[in-house]
Amino acid sequence: MEKNITPMMRQYLDIKKKYKDAIIFFRVGSFYEMFFDDAIEASKLLNLTLTKRENVPMCGVPYHTSKEYIRKLILFDKKVAICEQASNLTSTGPLEREVVEVITPGVIVDEDFLNDDVNNYLVAISDYKNYYSFSYIDLSTSSLGVMFYENSFFEKLKRDLEKYSPKEIIVSENFYYQYLHKLNLSRFLINRVPAWHLDKDIAIKTIKEHFNILGLSSLGFDEEKPYYISIFLIINHIKNNLKNLLSNIDKIDINNDSSYMFLDDVTQVNLELVKNNNDFSSQYSLYSVLNDCKTAMGKRLLREFILNPILNISEINTRLDHVEFFYKNISLTMTLREAFINIWDIERIISRIQMKRYIKKDFLFIEKALSVFFLVKKLFDKHNFDYWNFDKFEEDSVSKVYFLINSAISDSSDELIKRGYDLKLDNLKDLKINANKYIDEYLESERILSKINNLKIRKTNNRGLFFEVTKSNYSQVPSHFMESQTLSSSKRYKTEKLISLEVDINNAEDSVVAFEQEIFDEIAANVVKHNKVLKKVAEFFAYIDLVVNFGYLAKKNEYKRPVLTSDKEIFLDKSRHPVVEHYVKNAEIFTENFVRINKERHFCLITGPNMAGKSTYLRQVALITLMAHIGSFVPASKALIGITDKIFCRIGASDNLAKGESTFLVEMNETANILRNATEKSLIIMDEVGRGTSTNDGLAIAYSIIEYILEYIKARSLFATHFHELSAINHKAFINLSMKIEKQGNDLVFLREIEEKPSLNSYGIYVARIAGLPLKVIDRANAILESLLSRKGSSFLEFLPYISSDSNDKEALKNDTDVNVKLNEYLELKNFISNIDINNITPFQSIELLNQIVLKVISQSS
């Protein structure tokens, strides 16, 4: 094999050694060829015919259709190295080839590979010297940011992986094996970097060189605290794979965690904020309900808002003011929505232009967007809307770009640069189009000058253009005619002008293409000079599109403006679940419900049957709270909502087989996270905690969780349960709620309406009956239930410690009332009494047993 290998195959093998983890698209003429294992793998994934040549497996795709094949490989989380011919066909020896880029899921910039409404993130995670940081980049939008994890880093890491849903992750090998292997990361492409690649000095040098700065302090970093290592990992990865495609990255956003509501990964999933838990699409998510934006930029900003609710009341109210303006000015809102249809994704277009990956339509799209920009300014001035953050200099900059594109770029498919923009180009185009006309005009001018009436211009393949003069006219040949050939009956002549005209005509087509491209590149370079203001225009459109969208939806769906306060309250009147209401609108009227939570009464226990709407009610409160924090109106007739620093939502659970965790363990892990991290300003949503174990264990755990929240965390909480015994809890902050039902003979009607009283029955057997269980099973279940109820003795809660509302008892509760201990004592006493056979003891023995019971009770009470 080594002896018989061709120079081209040797070239391929040398390149493959450098890109072992990528599928090489090896350019051969008008095809990209793949060889060996690459060919075998690609043929399966792309459904290509696998062939062999000299025992080398191979397959290929045409160059002009290669994008679609590359896109499919990226969807399979594969890396694709594009290897192009670097020399022309006239060179001697084998063609030179080089890898011009490595396309991976996280560094896509081609619009054909991207989703309009979703950012395409590459993420890097660093734990260098125990300075934990998380950096992210969307190369297509020039978004680069970093977060410092100063505490609770693992919980924040899980949150951010869910929030950003990166296509690709870069991480050190040590960090991966220490932490990331604990997570289910099968959906991500992982790049593990050897620890020795993480060098502080090299990182500083690399970042300084890219941003052309003297020190990292100008970016907001302390060089002695290497949180910037994750930024270095991103820059290095892109430089190695995409050569010079970092030119569009000119700033770093350093995110302040305390400015945003904390939504852990479990809460994001359980509330189905941006994707559902069935097929993981956006349908049936909160995002799908709130997304009627007209621009791709607005759609992405909406997703960002939903996953990053803000905590500053002033900032929230500013957003709400803007939404209210468009809510009240619906005619303006509809005009803007119509205009925004003409705005393409200029955020990504600007990035492509900076990276020199532009085409003509990109500039035409910018021109259209900027025309809308001027329209919006006029409309805002007319309606006295004061959100306009562009100064005169920036407006002039936008005008320059608009008029440059408008005067230069043609919207005709026949040309790139408009006529009239460049005189030299116009002349070349005229020459190309009117070659025969110019030849005829020149011929006529020479006829007049020479007075040779039969003077002709002819053309041959060998001699090109020439004048032909017959013998009778030799004496009239002008002095500037240069003889080139003598024939028997005529002579052929050339002139300097004819030679020049011929050269111009022959080169006209190539010259037009080359010169147009030169002018086009100059225009692109001029547009890039205004990239900062153009990015600001893109951000402006995204925000206005979003608040216009919120105003439109508020009017359409009868949402109302929430009032944000600094108090610990959630007051909702006639509230609805935004997602359920949206998707069942044509089927039934959604039942409106109230919520009354304040500083004094902040823990709601919700009981009632399955199917009655408990889970819907829980999510409804959480989603409305979140909507208020992103600046949206909410589905309620009235809403007062205290600023909420964190939302925790533990609803449902399933086995984590990959980690060997049962449903119950998953449930307890999630609950532990809530109890560790919730604060008095948080909102806790818990549904059926404790159901995954025995009744006694589950009831005891649920009780102790409620006790802990009431006494120590004091967060606003909604706790749905089928443990009806818990409704007997006596605490001043405790509220009993239940879902109304109505009996109609043997049937139940679920009214899905909340009321302030406990429910005494879960009606599980009724639900089983309407689900279609056999009648014998239902009858038997009813009989067993009656038997169990007839045997039920004292309330479980009678044996649990009193939950005091008096703050003086808190320390005693901390030190002396371990619920698990008390529960064990209760069970021990219960078993002791249950084992007494009262039919076979003497009076003396009964007195002795009674004495033992009294002593046990006294010892347990001491």
Swiss-Prot record:
Belongs to the DNA mismatch repair MutS family. The keyword Calcium does not apply. It comes from the Bacteria. The gene is mutS. CDD domains: ABC_MutS1 (cd03284). This is DNA mismatch repair protein MutS. This protein is involved in the repair of mismatches in DNA. It is possible that it carries out the mismatch recognition step. This protein has a weak ATPase activity. It holds the Pfam family MutS_I. GO terms for biological process: mismatch repair. GO terms for molecular function: ATP binding; ATP-dependent DNA damage sensor activity; damaged DNA binding; mismatched DNA binding. SUPFAM superfamilies: DNA repair protein MutS, domain I, DNA repair protein MutS, domain II, DNA repair protein MutS, domain III, P-loop containing nucleoside triphosphate hydrolases. The keyword DNA-binding applies. SMART domains: MUTSac, MUTSd. Signal peptide: none annotated. Keywords: ATP-binding, DNA damage, DNA repair, DNA-binding, Nucleotide-binding. NCBIfam families: mutS1 (TIGR01070), PRK05399.1 (NF003810). ATP binds at residues 608-615.
